[in-house]
Swiss-Prot record:
<keyword id="KW-0639">Primosome</keyword>
<keyword id="KW-0235">DNA replication</keyword>
<dbReference type="GO" id="GO:0006269">
    <property type="term" value="P:DNA replication, synthesis of primer"/>
</dbReference>
<feature type="domain" description="SSB">
    <location>
        <begin position="8"/>
        <end position="108"/>
    </location>
</feature>
<dbReference type="InterPro" id="IPR000424">
    <property type="entry name" value="Primosome_PriB/ssb"/>
</dbReference>
<keyword id="KW-0238">DNA-binding</keyword>
<dbReference type="GO" id="GO:1990077">
    <property type="term" value="C:primosome complex"/>
</dbReference>
<dbReference type="Pfam" id="PF22657">
    <property type="entry name" value="SSB_1"/>
</dbReference>
<protein>
    <recommendedName>
        <fullName>Replication restart protein PriB</fullName>
    </recommendedName>
</protein>
<comment type="similarity">
    <text>Belongs to the PriB family.</text>
</comment>
<dbReference type="InterPro" id="IPR023646">
    <property type="entry name" value="Prisomal_replication_PriB"/>
</dbReference>
<dbReference type="GO" id="GO:0003697">
    <property type="term" value="F:single-stranded DNA binding"/>
</dbReference>
<comment type="function">
    <text>Involved in the restart of stalled replication forks, which reloads the replicative helicase on sites other than the origin of replication; the PriA-PriB pathway is the major replication restart pathway. During primosome assembly it facilitates complex formation between PriA and DnaT on DNA; stabilizes PriA on DNA. Stimulates the DNA unwinding activity of PriA helicase.</text>
</comment>
<comment type="subunit">
    <text>Homodimer. Interacts with PriA and DnaT. Component of the replication restart primosome. Primosome assembly occurs via a 'hand-off' mechanism. PriA binds to replication forks, subsequently PriB then DnaT bind; DnaT then displaces ssDNA to generate the helicase loading substrate.</text>
</comment>
<dbReference type="InterPro" id="IPR012340">
    <property type="entry name" value="NA-bd_OB-fold"/>
</dbReference>
Amino acid sequence: MLKSNLEVDNRFSLIGKVADFPKRNKSPSGIDHCLFYLEHRSNKKEAGFTRQAWCKIAIQISGNQLIEKTQSITVGQQLLVVGFVTSHRSSNGLNQLVLHAEQIEFIE
């Protein structure tokens, strides 16, 4: 527990643009999934200097409530994604950081 009484141990939020078309599938247990990449670019102050921040991260969306929101996601659209991060092992054996979305907000 933090001094602020917040229970935050794995919380991540990122604003960025959708970098590719969402890929949808259904698990053997019948759960709908959607995967796409979000690209973030910004300028941040660090140690008194401005630096460019850039990342491209996989976004995993699962379950019926959020999957409905993915129907209107298009490449280039700006989103706020909030969720938790975990590592997935890709088919080539490399670990990749993935943001599992719990909240999605479209930014105009």
